[in-house]
From Swiss-Prot:
<dbReference type="Pfam" id="PF04101">
    <property type="entry name" value="Glyco_tran_28_C"/>
</dbReference>
<dbReference type="InterPro" id="IPR007235">
    <property type="entry name" value="Glyco_trans_28_C"/>
</dbReference>
<dbReference type="GO" id="GO:0051301">
    <property type="term" value="P:cell division"/>
</dbReference>
<dbReference type="GO" id="GO:0030259">
    <property type="term" value="P:lipid glycosylation"/>
</dbReference>
<keyword id="KW-0808">Transferase</keyword>
<protein>
    <recommendedName>
        <fullName>UDP-N-acetylglucosamine--N-acetylmuramyl-(pentapeptide) pyrophosphoryl-undecaprenol N-acetylglucosamine transferase</fullName>
        <ecNumber>2.4.1.227</ecNumber>
    </recommendedName>
</protein>
<keyword id="KW-0961">Cell wall biogenesis/degradation</keyword>
<dbReference type="GO" id="GO:0009252">
    <property type="term" value="P:peptidoglycan biosynthetic process"/>
</dbReference>
<keyword id="KW-1003">Cell membrane</keyword>
<feature type="binding site">
    <location>
        <position position="165"/>
    </location>
    <ligand>
        <name>UDP-N-acetyl-alpha-D-glucosamine</name>
    </ligand>
</feature>
<keyword id="KW-0472">Membrane</keyword>
<feature type="binding site">
    <location>
        <position position="190"/>
    </location>
    <ligand>
        <name>UDP-N-acetyl-alpha-D-glucosamine</name>
    </ligand>
</feature>
<dbReference type="InterPro" id="IPR006009">
    <property type="entry name" value="GlcNAc_MurG"/>
</dbReference>
<feature type="binding site">
    <location>
        <begin position="11"/>
        <end position="13"/>
    </location>
    <ligand>
        <name>UDP-N-acetyl-alpha-D-glucosamine</name>
    </ligand>
</feature>
<keyword id="KW-0132">Cell division</keyword>
<comment type="function">
    <text>Cell wall formation. Catalyzes the transfer of a GlcNAc subunit on undecaprenyl-pyrophosphoryl-MurNAc-pentapeptide (lipid intermediate I) to form undecaprenyl-pyrophosphoryl-MurNAc-(pentapeptide)GlcNAc (lipid intermediate II).</text>
</comment>
<keyword id="KW-0573">Peptidoglycan synthesis</keyword>
Amino acid sequence: MKRVLLTTGGTGGHIFPALAVAEEIRRQYPAADILFVGGSYGPEARIVPAHGIRFEGLPVRGVMGRGLKAPLALAAMTAGVARGMRLVGRFNPDVVIGFGGYAAFAAMVAAKLREKPCAVHEQNSVPGMANRLLAKIADRVFISFPDPQEYFLQRKTVLTGNPVRAAIAAAGAHRAGHVPACRLLVMGGSQGAHALNLAVVNMLPQLRDAGVEILHQTGAADLETVRSAYDKAGVQATVVDFVEDMAAAYAWTDLALCRAGATTVFELAAAGVPAVFVPFPFATHDHQTANAAFLADRGAAQSIAQRDLESMPPAVLAGQIIDLLKDHGRLQGMSAAMRRMARPEAAAAIVSGAKDLIRKKPLRSLVPEREGE
């Protein structure tokens, strides 16, 4: 494996699994040349180079939900495919792996037109529109959750789990003997979540009186408002727009109050962190609700619909959070259930599957089967 092109972007939920695979490729093939192709306007343009990986941006934007701007986005996507064709021809990758999102679309189509081996990885239990389309042209489809609905052709689909970075897995090892200390991690994904921010701000007096320590990722839009609310409530906490070191955050906390994007779900599982999920209700095909249900049904988490969160008296939500934080036995049981859902071998499985694709080997199981799958 000499040259690998990875492509995705738009949100951390797509970007970080791709970075985990890049990390594994570097571990197995230190001399491999990795090129990451994403959107010029997405967070990948900042995040990927910061991880020491060469990045090429295509001037593409999402087409779905853009209304009158959709024709312009479609024109940009077409131009992105043309530019992607030149880029793929120049780089000449052994294999191309896409991780979903509109930013992967142009590069994947370009790679297929160049007749390069192509694979896609789907992070969520319900696939997004980009991967539903790209799976039709891909040679392999790697999935994070079992696929009882058969969204993808079974003859080219293999379960791998969702890859997490080595530092996140190491946080899980660090937490093996973790003694709960009434610590809460609040995060709404890489861009924050206004509904979560508001809910936590409204219950700050109860959390303060219960002695709860808080690390709160607000997203950029709400940072100053939330910081001001903590100051007014007299709550000492770490309030940031973005947590740079998620591994340290997972190692520190006892419980997460968060969205249920697939990357968050699998990182929590790898780290063994129990969660109260508030799925983003407007996610494509409501995939976050399905992700949360998968963990809640197995005793690793609780799930609250956003409409219920918004109508719930602050004291009720605070009571639910505080009761969990004070119940060490229950937290430890949820943590153990989280660990059972982890897929620490996911990145290696995807690299192995990509290697099979290059060598034109038939589809095979890449991870051990588990009870209930």
